[in-house]
C-alpha cells in the first residue's frame, strides 16, 4: 500500500502542500490531490485555481476517469523553485541544487576545514556564493552534518568528527545567506529523501542505515523522522560491541568498543592491516580491490564486519519494528562481501516473527548526501508536525508566493 507524505490539516500548509505533492509525485488530478492530502474537493479546486493564477502550477492533458468526464492533470511550472543542499564533512562541503521532483540540477564541492577558527563564517561564505549564483527562486537551504542536532529549526550541532560542540550552525548560516536554513543529522536527511522520493512512498515505518566512514541510522516511524529527546536518535554506530579488553578499539566519539570503531572504514582498514591483508598505507579502496580480485583474507574482513553489523542491527529491529530496512552509503559498493557475514548473522539474531524483514540495498552516488540535505527544505510543505518550525514556515511562504 502506498503512503502519501501525510495529511495537510492546517490552512497555511495547503498551497505549499499541493505544490510539494506535484513535485514529489508528478502530474496529478485534483481528485487524487484531495485524497492524498486529506482535503475536500472544494478546497483543492479553490487553492489550485489560485496557484494557477500565480503561475506556480498549470493544467496539463486530460486522462480517463472512473465513469465521469476526463480529469485534467495538474503539474508544476518550470520555475516553481529549487532547494540547495549541503553535506558537511571533515575535509569538504558538497553542495547540490535540487528541483522539487528531486532531480539534481548541479553539484559542486569546496575544500573545507571544520576545525578552523573561522569554520562557520567560512561555511556561510561558501553557501552565500552558491546562493548568489542561482538563477532560480531559492526556497531554502538544507544542511546535513555527521552529528547530533538539537532541532532542524534551530540547528545547534554537536559533531566530534568536525570538532564542533554546541556549534550555532543554523543561526550563523541564516545570518550569512538571508534564507531559510534547516539543519539535521546527515543520515536523517537521507531518511527525509526516502520519504519524498524513495521507499517512504510505499512504507510509513523504516530504517535508513548507512555504512562507510561511519555507521548511522535514520529512523522513520508513522511517516515522521524519530529524533529522540535531544536530536541524537539513530547513532547505532556507537552501540558497544566489545566482549573483552582486546575488543575495545578507540572510537571518534571518545569512547571505545563502538560498532563504528570496528566496522566503519577506519576500523576495517585497521583490521586488514593487523592481519597483513593490506600494507601500512593501505586504504579501504585497497581492501575492496583485494576482495574483488578473490583475496579470501580481504573478503573475510568484510564478512566479519557484516556479521557484527547484522547482530547490532537485529537489536535495532527488535526495538523499532520497521517495515523495511534500507542500506546505503559509500560502503555499499562492496556489499557483496559484507553480505556473506551479514545475512546469516542478522537473520539468526532476529525473533521468529521478524526474520522476514526486508533489507534493500540502494546504489550509491556521492550526490545523495547533499540531495538528502536539500530534502529537508523540500519536505517543508508536508511538515504538519512542525519539525522545521519557523524555517519550514518560511519555505512554505516562498513556495506559495507569486
Curated annotation (Swiss-Prot):
Belongs to the ROK (NagC/XylR) family. This is Cyclobis-(1-6)-alpha-nigerosyl repressor. Transcriptional repressor of cyclobis-(1-6)-alpha-nigerosyl (CNN) degrading enzymes. One of its GO terms (molecular function) is DNA binding. InterPro entries: ATPase_NBD (IPR043129), ROK (IPR000600), ROK_cs (IPR049874), WH-like_DNA-bd_sf (IPR036388), WH_DNA-bd_sf (IPR036390). Residues 30-49 bind DNA. PROSITE patterns: ROK. It holds the Pfam family ROK. The keyword Transcription applies. Keywords: Carbohydrate metabolism, DNA-binding, Repressor, Transcription, Transcription regulation.
Amino acid at each position: 500500500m502506498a503512503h502519501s507524505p501525510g495529511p495537510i490539516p492546517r490552512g497555511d500548509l495547503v498551497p505549499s502542500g499541493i505544490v510539494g505533492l506535484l513535485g514529489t509525485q508528478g502530474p496529478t488530478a485534483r481528485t487524487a490531490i484531495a485524497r492524498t492530502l486529506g482535503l475536500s474537493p472544494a478546497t483543492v479546486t479553490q487553492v489550485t485555481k489560485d496557484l494557477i493564477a500565480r503561475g506556480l502550477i498549470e493544467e496539463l492533458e486530460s486522462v480517463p476517469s472512473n465513469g465521469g468526464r476526463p480529469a485534467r492533470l495538474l503539474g508544476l511550472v518550470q520555475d516553481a523553485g529549487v532547494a540547495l543542499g549541503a553535506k558537511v564533512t571533515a575535509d569538504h562541503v558538497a553542495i547540490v541544487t535540487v528541483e522539487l521532483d528531486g532531480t539534481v540540477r548541479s553539484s559542486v564541492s569546496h575544500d573545507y576545514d571544520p576545525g578552523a577558527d573561522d569554520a562557520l563564517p567560512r561555511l556561510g561564505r561558501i553557501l552565500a556564493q552558491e546562493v548568489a549564483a542561482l538563477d532560480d527562486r531559492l526556497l531554502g537551504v538544507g544542511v546535513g552534518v555527521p552529528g547530533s542536532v538539537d532541532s532542524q529549526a534551530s540547528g545547534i550541532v554537536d559533531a566530534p568528527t568536525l570538532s564542533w560542540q554546541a556549534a550555532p550552525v543554523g543561526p550563523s548560516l541564516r545570518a550569512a545567506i538571508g534564507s531559510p536554513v534547516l539543519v539535521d543529522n546527515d543520515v536523517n536527511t537521507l531518511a527525509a529523501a526516502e520519504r519524498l522520493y524513495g521507499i517512504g512512498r510505499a512504507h510509513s515505518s523504516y530504517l535508513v542505515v548507512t555504512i562507510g566512514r561511519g555507521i548511522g541510522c535514520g529512523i522513520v516511524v508513522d511517516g515522521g523522522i524519530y529524533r529522540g529527546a535531544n536530536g541524537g536518535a539513530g547513532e547505532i554506530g556507537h552501540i558497544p560491541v566489545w566482549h573483552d579488553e582486546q575488543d575495545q578499539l578507540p572510537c571518534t566519539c571518545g569512547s571505545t568498543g563502538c560498532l563504528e570503531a570496528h566496522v566503519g572504514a577506519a576500523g576495517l582498514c585497521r583490521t586488514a592491516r593487523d592481519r597483513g591483508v593490506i600494507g601500512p598505507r593501505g586504504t579501504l579502496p585497497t581492501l575492496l580491490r583485494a576482495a574483488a580480485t578473490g583475496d579470501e583474507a580481504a573478503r573475510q574482513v568484510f564478512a566479519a564486519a557484516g556479521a557484527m553489523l547484522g547482530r547490532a542491527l537485529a537489536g535495532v529491529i527488535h526495538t523499532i519494528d520497521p517495515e523495511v530496512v534500507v542500506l546505503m552509503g559509500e560502503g555499499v559498493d562492496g556489499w557483496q562481501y559484507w553480505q556473506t557475514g551479514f545475512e546469516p548473522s542478522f537473520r539468526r539474531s532476529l525473533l521468529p516473527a521478524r526474520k522476514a524483514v526486508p533489507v534493500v540495498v540502494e546504489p550509491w552516488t556521492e550526490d545523495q548526501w547533499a540531495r538528502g540535505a536539500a530534502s529537508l527544505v523540500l519536505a517543508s510543505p508536508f511538515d504538519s508536525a512542525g519539525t522545521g518550525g519557523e524555517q519550514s514556515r518560511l519555505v512554505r511562504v516562498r513556495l506559495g508566493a507569486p
